[in-house]
């Protein structure tokens, strides 16, 4: 059998060589094609007032993201409020990527080809160019972002009483990490709790709801109740 060198990745001992070898062995794409980069440049860096039409404005809510310390593409955010002794409101907000990435367009085809973002020890191979994944499609703190939201009313046993899915616009107040949330809710860090007082004015609500949901089985079917088509009453938020 004969073989030939098709590419030299580096020298033995080079930093990152092992990771690069894994990338090559699995035929993972390192770069985006020029046409994909060009398409990403045509996507705006911020949203316009006209784009808010038909979306529910949730920018007044203290919504936060909770991710790893090194995460850059923040695609989901949450808000929770205890409505009464036996009921919580949980809002989950997902970046509305489909608003910017149209079906069968260049960006969509590239994302389908990649299938997912790949997280390695020293880098991330994103499904979309960083201008989108870390920019307008990332729920960065202090920025208005277009989202798809699901608001759920959950009882004290963790059962979903009702839910509603709708297009929205949010303004993330803080970028939290799992470490920060753990320090506040589990370890009782008073300094951090004071810093994020507005968000954790009901820390027991976060903790109680989190404990309920962690032990729930994942249902095969969504709740029987259909999503509401009208906005919830003001007291729901």
Placement of each model-derived feature along the sequence:
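Charge-lined substrate channels and their catalytic hotspots, especially those that engage the 3′ end
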Residues: 1-91, 98-143, 182, 198, ...
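A glycine-rich phosphate-binding loop feature that marks nucleotide/adenosyl-phosphate handling sites
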Residues: 6-8, 167-169, 224
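Residue-level recognition of well-ordered beta-strand positions that form the cores
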Residues: 79, 91-93, 151-153, 212
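Conserved catalytic alpha/beta cores of large enzymes that bind or transform nucleotide phosphates
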Residues: 117-210
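N-terminal low-complexity segments that are often proline-rich with Ser/Thr-Pro
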Residues: 201-237
């Amino acid at each position: 059998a004969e073989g030939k060198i098709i590419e030299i990745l580096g020298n033995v001992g080079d930093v990152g060589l092992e990771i690069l070898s894994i990338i090559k062995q699995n035929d993972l794409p390192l770069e985006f094609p020029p046409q994909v980069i060009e398409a990403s440049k045509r996507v705006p860096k911020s949203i316009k007032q006209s784009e808010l039409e038909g979306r529910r404005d949730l920018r007044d809510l203290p919504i936060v993201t909770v991710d790893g310390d090194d995460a850059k593409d923040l695609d989901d955010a949450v808000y929770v409020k205890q409505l009464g002794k036996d009921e919580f409101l949980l809002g989950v907000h997902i970046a509305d990527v489909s608003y910017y990435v149209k079906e069968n367009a260049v960006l969509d085809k590239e994302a389908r080809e990649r299938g997912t973002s790949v997280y390695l020890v020293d880098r991330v191979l994103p499904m979309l160019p960083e201008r989108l994944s870390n920019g307008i499609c990332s729920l960065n703190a202090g920025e208005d972002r277009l989202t798809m939201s699901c608001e759920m009313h959950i009882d004290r046993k963790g059962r979903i009483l009702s839910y509603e899915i709708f297009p929205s616009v949010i303004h993330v107040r803080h970028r939290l990490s799992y470490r920060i949330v753990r320090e506040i809710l589990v370890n009782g860090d008073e300094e951090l709790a004071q810093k994020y007082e507005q968000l954790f004015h009901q820390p027991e609500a976060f903790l109680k709801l989190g404990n309920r949901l962690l032990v729930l089985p994942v249902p095969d079917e969504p709740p029987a109740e259909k999503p509401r088509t009208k906005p919830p009453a003001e007291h729901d938020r």
